[in-house]
Design a protein with these regions (language model features):
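N-terminal soluble domains immediately following signal/targeting peptides that reside
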Residues: 29-182, 188-336
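Bacterial N-terminal signal peptides
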Residues: 13-25, 184-186
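Selective for proline/serine-rich intrinsically disordered segments
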Residues: 1-5, 24, 39, 195
Length: 337
């Protein structure tokens, strides 16, 4: 027979464990960090190389309060190849587009980015708080192609089929034994040589941009100096990358608090000229500006990227030829076939 003291002891132990769970559970739950991602405009409205989007991250505790003293490492990867038709920038497919570390301000951080191609992007976010808490989230989202491009492709496809149809009827009228149609599509992409400008510096701010090549990350860095030495004071930095030919902002951070320096790994998506500007507001010195114009080295896309489209267009013309020839023979009297 069990002792009453044994039963009381076990019951007390169960009550103690239950109370401990209620007391310490909030503390354990408080260790969690929530990561939220938002774009403006909404993802459904974004299109490749149309307008830059505002990308924002919000980091909160489990109770919804913003986390102030923390940094986030952000990595953005381009869509992988896989569609029948390649994108406008096949070299960019499956590569890393951007990587940087940002400091939270009231639990938030935001930046501008112009998505270069259609497809499924992957954004990896690693959060590290000052008290040691960490969180990692991966956001996968899709950017749709411009509707006007699909309409243009459809119209061009119809035009090729009609061209083949007309050619089939013309060649059949001459009663030739065979008709050979050759479609030669040559796409020449001239890679512009990259000229690496020497870093420009003023009395306190220094902007540096590594030589840029399509398909590879280039380091963009800005740091504050005092008499040639690093100055760790906190400033608000605005960094902007602009596509000069299209006049569009492809990347920007605005009034980002930094401790004397900032760096990002950024891929310039095409072989064109870009302007990189940096502006910082310093308490006792006022605004500081820096600017560089760089030429990005383009790379000729592999033949396999254009092969599906080439075969598709040739197939349309061949189908039109066959249908045109068949319709002409079908309409002719039996003695003239």
């Amino acid at each position: 027979m069990r002792s009453p003291w044994c039963l009381v002891t076990k019951a007390s132990l169960h009550v103690f464990i239950l109370l401990a769970c209620f007391v310490f559970a909030p503390a354990l739950w408080g260790q969690e960090l929530n990561v939220y991602f938002k774009t403006t405009p909404r993802l459904e409205l974004l299109r490749p190389f149309a307008d830059p989007a505002d990308l924002a991250l919000l980091i909160t505790d489990a109770d919804g309060r913003p986390v102030d003293n923390a940094t986030v490492n952000v990595r953005l990867d381009a869509p992988t190849p896989g569609g029948f038709f390649s994108t406008d920038m096949p070299i960019v497919e499956g590569t890393r587009l951007n990587e940087m570390t940002l400091k939270l301000r009231q639990g938030r951080v935001s930046w501008k980015y112009l998505f270069p191609i259609r497809g499924e992007y992957k954004l990896v976010v690693d959060v590290r708080a000052a008290d040691g808490r960490q969180a990692a989230r991966t956001f996968v989202f899709k950017i749709r192609e411009n509707e006007s491009k699909w309409l243009a492709l459809g119209a061009f496809s119809v035009a090729l089929f009609v061209l083949g149809f007309g050619a089939g009827r013309v060649f059949t009228r001459t009663r030739a034994q065979a008709a050979l149609v050759v479609l030669a599509l040559s796409i020449g992409i001239s890679a512009r040589g990259m000229t690496a400008p020497s870093p420009q510096a003023n009395s306190v701010g220094k902007l540096e941009v590594e030589p840029a090549t399509v398909g590879k990350l280039s380091r963009i860095a800005w740091r504050l100096e005092n008499a040639g030495q690093p100055d760790p004071r906190t400033v608000l930095l605005t960094l902007t990358v602009t596509h000069l030919e299209k006049g569009k902002i492809v990347f920007a951070v605005e009034k980002l608090p930094i401790a004397g320096e900032f760096a990002t790994q950024f891929q310039f998506p095409d072989g064109a000229e870009y302007r990189v500007t940096a502006a910082a507001n310093i308490a006792d010195l006022g605004p500081v500006h820096g600017e560089q114009v760089i030429s990005v080295a383009g790379i000729e896309p592999p033949a396999r990227a254009a092969a599906p489209a080439l075969f598709y267009f040739i197939g349309l013309i061949a189908a039109g030829l066959g249908v045109g020839r068949w319709s002409k023979i079908r309409a002719a009297p039996p003695e003239r076939r």
